[in-house]
Amino acid sequence: MHPAHLLVLLAVCVSLLGSSEIPQPSLDFEQFSNMIQCTIPCGESCLAYMDYGCYCGPGGSGTPIDDLDRCCKTHDECYAEAGKLSACKSVLSEPNNDTYSYECNEGQLTCNDDNDECKAFICNCDRTAVTCFAGAPYNDLNYNIGMIEHCK
């Protein structure tokens, strides 16, 4: 393929990605990871939640493959709902510029009352997802499964 054609193809792909309705990541991925650590002490293996099943990680499609994947689908849907709140428009457009406030006490997560409407909503999306993760078994066979083949 001619290099100019590759550039056009790349531009189209980037354009399509930019216009798709992929839910934004947590306000602060590190915060979400810390929430996971609070509830499920997993060390470096917490990253395994970022490429699991059809919904854990960027994007998501098809039918969730198990309970843990359903937790991630619900989390994606929660973020989509947050995107509909007028209070969240500026926060979600630049998600790493702000963080929500929460506490971890003996494995229990609480979103603090000092969060504004959007941060409270997103904190609860993340808290609910992490609580769901804690109750769902992790199946090593569903890590990095290849979305194209398995998530239609």
From Swiss-Prot:
Expressed by the venom gland. Glycans are attached at residue 97. Keywords: Disulfide bond, Glycoprotein, Secreted, Sialic acid, Signal. Pfam families: Phospholip_A2_1. GO terms for molecular function: calcium ion binding; calcium-dependent phospholipase A2 activity; phospholipid binding; signaling receptor binding. Contains 0.9% fucose, 2.2% mannose, 4.2% N-acetyl-D-glucosamine, 3.5% galactose, and 3.8% N-acetyl-neuraminic acid (sialic acid). It comes from the Eukaryota. Coiled coil: none annotated. Heterotrimer: Snake venom phospholipase A2 (PLA2) heterotrimer that acts as a potent presynaptic neurotoxin by blocking synaptic transmission and synaptic vesicle recycling. May act by binding in a calcium-dependent fashion to neurotonal pentraxin-1 (NPTX1) and neurotonal pentraxin-2 (NPTX2), but not to neuronal pentraxin receptor (NPTXR). Also binds to taipoxin-associated calcium binding protein 49 (RCN2), a protein localized in the lumen of endoplasmic reticulum. Monomer (gamma chain): Snake venom phospholipase A2 homolog that is neither toxic nor enzymatically active. Does not bind calcium. This is Acidic phospholipase A2 homolog taipoxin gamma chain.
